[in-house]
């Protein structure tokens, strides 16, 4: 849609190019920029973690989990698609999360009662279906979902897999759909290790009643943007971007502005 709008105005070809968000695409863009030593910033994909600590309020944690992965049917670069939950509350949390997920209203995105809409295209539907098939091949435990809905449009069920091995493709690869994978942890260091065990490092969420402990954990997590007891809030005054294969450079804030500026120093002796 954006491409059609831009093509309808008097904009020279090549000024705006619309590309899929993927590390492989970023590599090609970087290689082209290298030929002319051009400045570049890249905001690519993610496989962000949401860590739920033992002292977290389960009801609120479930709301953050659902909002972090099922908003826009998971088609958000910063979607928190890896759930890392403390083993002491895991059973209670998964029970409540399953109920709330299965009660989500799925339908037309323009309907105010809809809580999760469709995928954007048949291509993306096939992408998500591919990961459903991989999950079956890998014999992953499916808490809920894992199906294409038999209705007009590109609808799938909101899906949760539990006790997913870190070697699984669903744990390591960006699905870009409403698919959540999960593991449990015993110690904070275990949660941090799991969160950082990714080629991506865009965002993360920490859910805890202890803000000091959450801040301490946040300092050890490799991610460009970390929410504590919140999810998917992006402030224009704060820089946005990630590490590793999630990209280079920053958008928004003073960091984003500096990407479009050049510093110059003039020294005069007299």
What feature does the model see in each segment?
Residues 1, 29-31, 95-96, 218-219, ...:
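Short amphipathic alpha-helical segments
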Residues 23-25, 35, 212-213, 235:
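Short alpha-helical
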Residues 15, 25-165, 228:
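ALDH superfamily catalytic-core signature
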Residues 1-21:
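PLP-dependent aminotransferase-like
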Residues 11, 51, 105, 148, ...:
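Conserved C-terminal structural/oligomerization subdomain of aldehyde/semialdehyde dehydrogenase
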Residues 20-21, 56, 88-89, 186, ...:
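Short beta->alpha linker loops
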